[in-house]
Each structure stands twice: as structure tokens, then as C-alpha cells.
């Protein structure tokens, strides 16, 4: 019996520090809850010429945020007001702060890489990314709703 208690005590002395070290955390926020495929469900622009519902006009934005920090997807901006249609690849990377601010790094020069998005959830508990920023007098408001997890 004494030998068994000594063995148990020895295992605890050796095993407990190993367990504690294995559970060490990171200062970086977890990206796993944010990862998933998102699509624009609200996409408005407004400026001197008025407000435009970009989804109704034919614009789309779909982006997949992988758990490893990479992105894929596509942005299509419908032609309007003499501006031609724009198509852009959303390939790149994404990061999130502990305050749930998501930013994108992409080679495509679009508002997506220059707008911080806030991660949260809608009234039904579905993950959303919301962005709202003014670029050269045009306000862009976007809500991306997660369709699936990655």
C-alpha cells in the first residue's frame, strides 16, 4: 500500500507540471470561432449622388476565412455611374484582435483590405462581420454573414 502511495505521489509530482505546461496559453486571440465562409447580406454605398443598395445593383462579396489565417473569395462590384464593373480575388490573409476587429491583407486593391471589420453575431446568433468606412467621400457599409464554418 505504501509503495502504491509513493508511486502515485511520484506520478503527480512529475505529471502535474507537464500538464500545466501543456495547457499554457497564447496572447494571440483564437481565430477558430471567426473562421468560416461569409457573404454580403447588406452592402450599401452613399455619397454625393445618393445611396445605392449594392446587392440590389448586382454586386456580391463572398470571402472564406480559414482557421490558418488565409482567405479566398471574390468581390464583384456592378457597373454604375460611368464606372465599369470590378472583379477582385479575395485571396490573402486575415487577422483578428482580442477586441474582435478583423483586418485583411490582400493584393487586390479594394475597400476590403482598407476597412476594419468587427466580428460579432446577429440576433439569431449567426456570426457576422460588419464594416463601415468613408473612402474619398463615399461611405461603404457592409455586413458579411457566415454561411458555414471552415
Task: Outline where the language-model segments fall.
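N-terminal glycine/threonine-rich, aromatic-flanked beta-hairpin/loop signature
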Residues: 52-100
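An anionic, turn-rich surface loop/hairpin at beta-sheet edges
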Residues: 55, 101-119
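Short, solvent-exposed coil/turn segments at beta-strand boundaries
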Residues: 62-72, 96-100, 117-129, 146-150
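Edge beta-strand at a domain terminus
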Residues: 86-100, 132-150
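N-terminal helix-cap/turn-to-beta initiation motif at the start of protein domains
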Residues: 24-39, 64, 149-150
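Bacterial N-terminal signal peptides that target proteins for export
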Residues: 1-12
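C-terminal motif of bacterial Sec signal peptides marking the signal peptidase cleavage site
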Residues: 19-22
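Generic short beta-strand segments
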Residues: 39-46, 70-79, 107-108, 130-134
Amino acid at each position: 500500500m505504501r509503495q502504491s502511495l509513493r508511486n502515485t505521489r511520484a506520478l503527480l509530482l512529475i505529471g502535474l507540471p507537464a500538464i500545466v505546461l501543456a495547457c499554457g496559453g497564447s496572447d494571440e486571440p483564437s481565430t477558430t470561432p471567426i473562421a468560416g465562409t461569409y457573404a454580403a447580406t447588406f452592402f450599401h454605398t452613399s455619397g454625393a449622388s445618393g445611396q445605392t443598395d449594392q446587392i440590389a445593383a448586382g454586386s456580391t462579396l463572398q470571402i472564406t476565412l480559414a482557421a490558418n489565417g488565409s482567405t479566398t473569395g471574390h468581390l464583384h462590384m456592378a457597373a454604375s455611374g460611368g464606372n465599369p464593373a470590378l472583379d477582385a480575388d479575395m485571396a490573402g490573409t486575415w487577422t483578428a484582435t482580442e477586441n474582435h476587429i478583423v483586418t485583411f491583407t490582400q493584393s487586390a486593391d479594394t475597400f476590403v483590405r482598407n476597412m476594419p471589420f468587427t466580428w460579432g453575431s446577429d440576433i439569431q446568433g449567426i456570426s457576422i462581420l460588419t464594416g463601415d468606412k468613408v473612402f474619398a467621400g463615399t461611405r461603404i457599409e457592409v455586413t458579411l454573414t457566415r454561411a458555414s464554418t471552415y
